[in-house]
Amino acid sequence: MVPESPTVAHLSQVIHDVTAPAFLLGALAGFISLLMARMNRVIDRSQALNAIGDNDDVKGHLKSDIPRLKRRAALLNWAIFFSTISAIVASFLVIVSFASAYLSLQHEYVVGFLFILSIGFFVTSLLSLALETRIALHEFDHFGGK
């Protein structure tokens, strides 16, 4: 038994309804790109500091920054993880919206819950980025940068 095909008006309404999650997906893609760039910078700095010899009296003090870089990398890793989960949930939200329209199912509560869940993961990711940024700025002050 094939369900009744949705009307053009109904599909148009579904497309309208998934506009916010689609914009959220675009924002998350850009945000994950930003997080990856920050992570690459932290990794590059860690590799440079690890390359400093233990007997280097001139640059040896810079190695004290390695634990801070590890903490930043961990926070960025969590931010990337939560952003990715947010994007997956937002994608699932779009799928549920269209599948529900095709199958003529009520989906308002599920879609609302998925949107709240996706935004919650995004906020968690933003909080991880805020903590990482705070550590990065503290690090800058610690080494006398102005």
Question: What kind of feature is each model-predicted range?
Answer:
Residues M1-K146:
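Cytosol-facing regions at membranes
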